[in-house]
């Protein structure tokens, strides 16, 4: 197998030229070439498969060349097997000779298995996006007894096993039928000599007749090994290969022994028991599975490939499938915006500031963007600016949805207003209720990929904050985990509930886990991870809000209209600082910046609001119910408020004496 890396700039050497000849790479005037694909292809001239790995496995390294520093691309977290070099470049491992010289057995094993995950992901992407132009495919290598070549990739072997199962059901059925023919006939000689006879009405009766002796059959042993391999591939990689014959397969513990070498040993022991072409071919591919160095016969009559051009689109599709809402379920103009911009990921989830115990939860849009970079790459300012533009377009779209005057709206938008499943989402309250014109917070996020140094697919933490430095150290949270890099854009810094205040956090996802989860397509696994990720985004952004702002709850004094009048008359002072996020719309949320420069301004505003509202003395934790505290404050002022769990009874009281009697009973 030959190895290339996506978008790496190769010097045009003999090895590079031979390897990339089939796929027309991009070149420049300095005789450097790069390949903008991910996947693999078979080269008839090389008689080998070429595998193109994603650039996420590379990182930049600065080295000294003739006294000058230079940045080069190297394999991330991989050291040479031998020699004085401290790193491996993509050029080092193009050919099998270089791979054997530089790569450890562990890394070679990783590449073999990684090829299958890439194959599965590309197949799933093509199936779920039938009209895509991002995937190029021609018939894949199949095992056979025709022209032989040296290709022996794990991918070749796995696909050959699956293809053999699809095309040879008649072979299995015919062989099994012949093997079992006559197995239920009674062996009378052994029955008469071994079994006890009873005489009933002159007729001999044998309660335990002996069937014909079953001898060990090597065809069935080969079938058991073959179907056990298929079951292993189905479980590990998420293939859907049917196993239509009810053999007792090898247990997991037993199969592990086969993987560790016993499989090759046992197959060698029974090698010369087979004579038919199909039985020999089945033995070949089973042995090749257990011995990846075995020379597998593969048809080489035509060029074969499975390639993804612009793999960032595939990565985006994988992420959206795992955390987002499908674009076809999102109203027109919301994700595919009118100015030509397209939001990578969007979904509706619980709003940030509300009572988490409320049965009726208010939702808000979450907007995300995938960033398919090499390991360690940083966001540029253009990406951040574009994400804010997406969010502003969403805000305006939502406001338009609830406008009373629809004379200038297109028919498409009018239809959205009638049928939109997102219509329950209100970024801004109704005009008569929203006296302060506060806007709900729209969370935004970036997702980029990383790979663990030990290249594990499933880890305890498959999504984490993108690391950033402060005072020369990586910022960690109270649990010792990396905090996500968070950007806050605003026009006025002390206005959390303003349409121009946008919060954007950056996370890293385990690329191998995303590949694993997407390729397996197991609904339960995907649903659990989707819920966990969405909750993590919400919790992390809440922490950011609590770090930057003190959140208070407010309840109007008697006469709510008086409080509203104050807000209307002091509109500029409270603009962007108050919002009504709770089911109980009497209760307001007040957000005040923690920056020292606003300390006096915030104290004056809070004191002034205290003349018209009951305000919690201390900031409240986001997600908690402030009603008990607020109504307790109201009760201290002589006004009784009772929370009823089973409804409210309304009645008339004729006089004070009757009311005192009701109070004495203590049952109201």
Each language-model region and where it sits:
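Terminal, charged accessory segments of proteins
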Residues: 1-265, 278-296, 300, 472-630, ...
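Active-site metal-binding core of divalent-cation-utilizing nuclease and nuclease-like domains
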Residues: 21-44, 325-361
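Surface-exposed intrinsically disordered loops and tails
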Residues: 210, 411-427, 461-488
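Nuclease catalytic cores
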Residues: 272-275, 279, 283, 287, ...
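Short, contiguous acidic/charged loop-to-helix segments that flank catalytic cores in large enzymes
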Residues: 306-310, 331-338, 354, 373-385, ...
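Conserved catalytic cores of phosphodiester-cleaving nucleases, focusing on short active-site segments
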Residues: 323, 345-347, 351, 364-376
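Acidic, metal/cofactor-coordinating or nucleic-acid-engaging core segments within structured domains
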Residues: 379-458, 462-463
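Short beta-strand-centered aromatic/proline hotspots
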Residues: 643
């Amino acid at each position: 197998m030959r190895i290339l890396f996506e978008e790496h700039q190769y010097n045009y050497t003999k090895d590079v030229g031979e390897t990339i000849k089939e796929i027309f790479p991009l070149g420049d005037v300095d005789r450097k070439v790069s390949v903008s694909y991910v996947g693999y292809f078979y080269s008839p001239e090389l008689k080998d498969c070429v595998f193109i790995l994603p650039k996420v496995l590379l990182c930049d390294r600065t080295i000294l060349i003739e006294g000058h520093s230079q940045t080069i691309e190297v394999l991330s977290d991989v050291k040479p097997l031998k020699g004085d070099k401290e790193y491996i470049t993509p050029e080092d491992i193009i050919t099998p000779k270089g791979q054997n010289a530089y790569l450890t057995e562990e890394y070679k094993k990783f590449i073999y298995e990684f090829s299958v995950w890439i194959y599965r992901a590309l197949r799933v992407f093509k199936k779920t996006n039938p009209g895509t132009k991002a995937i190029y495919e021609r018939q894949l290598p199949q095992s056979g007894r025709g022209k032989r070549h040296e290709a022996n990739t794990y991918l070749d072997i796995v696909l050959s096993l699956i293809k053999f199962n699809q095309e040879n059901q008649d072979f299995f059925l015919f062989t099994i039928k012949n093997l079992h023919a006559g197995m239920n006939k009674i062996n009378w000689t052994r029955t008469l000599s071994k079994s006890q006879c009873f005489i009933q009405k002159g007729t001999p009766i044998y309660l335990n007749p002996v069937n014909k002796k079953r001898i060990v059959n090597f065809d069935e042993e080969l079938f058991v090994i073959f179907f056990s391999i298929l079951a292993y591939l189905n479980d590990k990689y998420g293939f859907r290969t049917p196993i239509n014959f009810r053999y007792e397969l090898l247990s997991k513990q037993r199969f592990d022994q086969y993987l560790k070498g016993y499989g090759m040993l046992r197959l060698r022991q029974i090698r010369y028991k087979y004579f038919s072409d199909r039985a020999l071919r089945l033995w070949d591919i089973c042995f090749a599975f257990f011995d990846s160095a075995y020379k597998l016969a593969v048809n080489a009559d035509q060029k074969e490939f499975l390639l993804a051009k612009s793999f960032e689109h595939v990565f985006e599709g994988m992420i959206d499938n795992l955390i987002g809402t499908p674009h076809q379920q999102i109203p027109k103009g919301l994700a595919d915006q009118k100015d030509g911009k397209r939001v990578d990921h969007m979904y509706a989830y619980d709003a940030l500031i509300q009572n988490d115990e409320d049965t009726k939860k208010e939702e808000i849009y979450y907007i995300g963007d995938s960033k398919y970079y090499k390991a360690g790459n940083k966001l540029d300012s253009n990406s951040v600016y574009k994400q804010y533009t997406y969010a502003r377009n969403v805000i305006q779209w939502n406001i338009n949805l609830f406008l009373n005057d629809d004379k200038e709206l297109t028919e498409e938008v009018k239809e959205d207003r009638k049928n939109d499943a997102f219509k329950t989402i209100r970024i801004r309250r109704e005009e008569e209720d929203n006296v302060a014109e506060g806007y709900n917070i729209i969370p935004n996020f970036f997702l980029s990929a990383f790979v663990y140094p030990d290249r594990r697919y499933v880890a305890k933490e498959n999504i984490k904050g993108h690391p950033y430095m402060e005072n020369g150290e990586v910022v960690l949270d109270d649990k010792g985990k990396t905090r996500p890099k968070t950007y806050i854009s605003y026009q006025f810094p002390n206005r959390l509930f303003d349409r121009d205040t946008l919060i954007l956090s950056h996370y890293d996802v385990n690329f191998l886990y995303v590949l694993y989860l997407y390729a397996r397509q197991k609904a339960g696994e995907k649903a659990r991870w989707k819920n966990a990720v969405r909750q993590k985004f919400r919790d992390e952004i809440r922490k950011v809000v609590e770090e930057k702002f003190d959140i208070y709850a407010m309840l109007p004094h008697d006469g709510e209209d008086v409080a509203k009048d104050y807000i209307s008359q002091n509109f500029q002072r409270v603009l962007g600082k108050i919002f009504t996020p709770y089911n109980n719309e009497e209760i307001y949320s007040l957000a005040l910046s923690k920056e020292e420069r606003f300390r006096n301004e915030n104290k004056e505003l809070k004191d002034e609001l205290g003349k018209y509202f009951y305000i919690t003395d201390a900031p409240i934790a986001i997600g908690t119910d402030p009603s008990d505290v607020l109504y307790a404050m109201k009760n201290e002022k002589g006004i009784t408020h009772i929370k009823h769990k089973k409804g409210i009874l309304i009645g008339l009281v004729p006089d004070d004496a009757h009311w005192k009697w009701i109070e004495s009973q203590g049952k109201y």
